[in-house]
């Protein structure tokens, strides 16, 4: 009886530790993927957002460049949805033109990006600004990253981009 009780406790401990390890692996993969992709995205996108430093507006030539960048390139194949946000929650640019100009509540993840942090998580596609994404995907990896002015380093806007969770799920399975 004592041996059976010990086995139950050991088994329960293994389940708890196993679950914790999987969550830690998933968290690490999410953070690493978000950070690496944010650097990659920033290297292509920030050039087209520098006009925000002078007038707070996105020029039409820059909108067109973002459209080209996100549709026919390797970056566009990797990113399934993309948004540029202002600090007050207004969408300056989106791969879903229907939400451009609309204002949404500022979530903590958006606020932390305006404070200079890169933040990645599995997206809550129930949010109002995710209507387009919710219709096409069951789960997405969402990353918020600050976009800085080239000459001052001031944060001009925040880019938000979505990736499918296929790579994430593959890495977590491999780690198990």
How should each PLM-predicted stretch be described?
Residues 33-45, 88, 112-124:
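Conserved long hydrophobic alpha-helices within structured protein cores
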Residues 1-8, 29, 173-176:
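Structural motif marking the loop-to-transmembrane transition
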Residues 3, 33-37, 74, 93, ...:
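Short acidic/polar alpha-helix capping motifs at helix-coil junctions
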Residues 20-51, 61, 65, 69, ...:
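Membrane-proximal extracytoplasmic alpha-helices
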């Amino acid at each position: 009886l004592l041996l059976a009780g010990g086995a139950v406790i050991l088994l329960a401990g293994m389940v708890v530790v196993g679950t914790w390890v999987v969550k830690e692996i998933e968290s690490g993969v999410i953070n690493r993927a978000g950070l690496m992709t944010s650097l990659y995205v920033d290297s292509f996108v920030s050039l087209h957002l520098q006009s925000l430093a002078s007038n707070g507006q996105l020029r039409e030539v820059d909108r067109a460049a973002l459209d080209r960048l996100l549709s026919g390139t390797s970056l566009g194949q990797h990113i399934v949805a993309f948004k540029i946000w202002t600090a007050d929650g207004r969408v300056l640019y989106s791969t879903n033109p229907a939400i451009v100009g609309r204002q949404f509540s500022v979530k903590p993840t958006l606020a932390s990006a305006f404070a200079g942090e890169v933040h990645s998580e599995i997206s809550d596609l129930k949010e109002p600004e995710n209507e387009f994404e919710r219709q096409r995907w069951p789960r997405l990896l969402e990353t918020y990253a600050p976009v800085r002015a080239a000459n001052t380093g001031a944060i001009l806007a925040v880019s938000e981009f979505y990736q499918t969770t296929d790579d994430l799920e593959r890495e977590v399975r491999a780690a198990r």
